[in-house]
């Protein structure tokens, strides 16, 4: 998907968008991908910076927009 989480924002009524900080299952990260019904998140503690799918309302807390996006090392 390439609509920057528009479906997720509308359907689930959450502020999901690429670049927003989140806490997923107690771990902090950043949304980096629109995955249709899911959001693609890179967790801060993942050294390989892999994008993982998360449901937008299950164990998810939304924060502010990130100032920088993580890069793969």
Regions found by a protein language model. Name each.
Residues 1-8:
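Short, structured beta-strand/loop micro-motifs enriched in basic residues and often containing a Trp
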Residues 66-71:
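Intrinsically disordered, low-complexity linker and terminal regions at domain boundaries
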């Amino acid at each position: 998907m390439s609509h920057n989480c528009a479906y997720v924002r509308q359907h689930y009524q959450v502020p999901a968008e690429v670049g927003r900080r989140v806490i997923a299952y107690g771990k902090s990260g950043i949304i980096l991908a629109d995955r249709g019904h899911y959001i693609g998140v890179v967790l801060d503690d993942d050294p390989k910076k892999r994008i993982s799918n998360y449901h937008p309302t299950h164990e998810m807390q939304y924060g502010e927009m990130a100032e920088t996006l993580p890069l793969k090392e």
